[in-house]
Amino acid sequence: MDFPERVAGAISACDIALIKRPLELSTDGHRTTGSPNLLTRPKILPVSSFPPIRRALISVSDKSGLVDFAKGLVSLGVEIYSTGGTRKHLLDNGVTAHEVASYTGFPEVMDGRVKTLHPKIFGGILARRNREDDLASLRSHGILEFDLVVVNLYPFETTVQKPDTVLTEAIEQIDIGGPSLLRAAAKNHEFVSVASQPNQYATILAEMKTHGGTSDSLRLQLAFDCFGETARYDATIADYLCRTILSNETFNPRGDEPSHSGLASIAMPQSITIPMKLQSGLRYGENPHQSAALYRLPGNSKATLTDAKQLNGKELSYNNLLDLDNALSIVRCFAKPSAVVMKHNNPCGGASAHKLSFACRKALAGDPQSAFGGVLGFNAMVDLETAEELCQPGLFIEAIVAPDFSPEAISLLQTKPKWRENVRLMKTGPLGTQPIELCYRFISGGVLVQQSDNQPPTSLNWKTVTDVAVAEELWDDIAFGWEMVRHVKSNAIILARDAALVGVGAGQMSRVDSVELAIEKAADRSHGSILASDAFFPFADSIERASKAGIIAIIQPGGSRKDDEVIAACNAHRIPMIFTGQRHFKH
């Protein structure tokens, strides 16, 4: 006997031994040890590749398209069971629907918190139609099969987007039964169809009309969509609770004493799930060979780009969105009418004034050459005067974001400039302040997470460290410059005069090079300007250069080992300097 025959013989003998081996039972009759008895395996029944849908369970919050869908199901002989408001909606529109509570024998309780959480519901969803033992269990307990589950969830995301929503209101919009029903149906997608979104109704009906049931591929796709929906729903809840914790200044999960060192004291979450939903595809990413899309995050109650209404122009690009977002972050920091000009995600111009049109003019004058092809942001409604500033000859603008645009401004921007058909006009509504959020940066094998650097600036900890004091008339420019510099890529230096940027040095590897660049951009406007630096000066060379350029005040975090040398240089050149104690790196 050769090797294959010996192996076959051994396998055959093993099979016979397993079949003949009696079950080892405990005193109560349950099997305790031994191999499974092949003769006790459940009987597997044949099933159709298009399982028929005879009975549907429907319980939805979003009732759009539901009546037509339900009528289509009834016309195909489907029996409908439903709950509360959904059943009333169906009955009011002439669709017969059995009451779930009458079927289960258990009423809806606790203000509707418990409706469908019952074995007679979940058994009918989870039963495997090809298992004789599962079907026997249904029969013995009087459980009906549900072949289609139609559920969408309480509007938690919509609720928490309202600015006046409190935690107790949000909690009541956390759906419990809905996700459970969806997950049960999706798990048993081999036999059960699940509709978690109204846009799936037409596809389900079309297959039912053609085949009498749904295909394996459709049920798998519906299950995939369903698990994505429930995962995003739970992640949205976790995200909201995380935001709630971050916004509570007194919250200290570690229970230790509050930090007064300027260092972060809030513990980061142990795990994070980022809920995102596709909002739109983009033509490409930063470069034409990169695919890209815009995804929406939940829970935004303030003005955002994902909520903004586009009033004019071509579709937004990946780079447009980056510039618009930073522009929005900058202008919402100022109380006075303000404007900013963005280029490659850095401000090349920015200003505040008593009128928006003046702020716009000053912002464009910050770096007129770089402003060409830029993106503009405003914190007040763009009126006709401001629009006229934007229509100056030789200026080309990619996109503009603002809380609103007057009809006259829209009309002018759509008709006068050469770029009228292309400029994207984005209306956000009232801006408000930007909440502290978590920011994410993907690295190889992981994600860096930090709080956003948008805490309102405070001068309480500012300290004049030089012998010469700051002139009273300079404080507005100093505050303006300190707010602007944190939005510039490090190493960041800005020069400001009369509440306007006159020079920006961004992204240089050496701080003195950023100083040189800002002075070069400002030219003769550097005389009488203030200088703001996002981090300390490691050497006194930047002070020497600032003095030659006519800079009359400096604000910076401090903290260098050579602070004494830097302070001495400022004293020597009679330049007042403020230490803020807070760094604003941006990488």
Model-derived regions: residue spans:
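Glycine- and Gly-Pro-enriched alpha-helical subdomains that act as flexible
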Residues: C348-P368, A500-I543
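Active-site/ligand-binding-proximal alpha/beta "capping" segment
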Residues: R129-I176, R183-A185, A469-E472
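Glycine-rich nucleotide/cofactor/substrate-binding loop typically near the N-terminus or early
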Residues: G85-F156, N252-R254, P258
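Short, low-complexity, charge-dense intrinsically disordered segments
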Residues: G9-C14, L18-K20, S26-P36
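N-terminal glycine-/serine-/threonine-rich phosphate-binding loop
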Residues: L38-Y103
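Cysteine/selenocysteine-centered motifs that mediate thiol-based redox chemistry or coordinate metal-sulfur cofactors
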Residues: L376-G377, D383-A387, C391-Q392, D524-D563
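C-terminal binding/interaction regions
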Residues: F396-P407, R545-F585
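Active-site loops and adjacent core secondary-structure elements that bind or stabilize anionic groups
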Residues: N199-D453, L474-M484, V488-A492
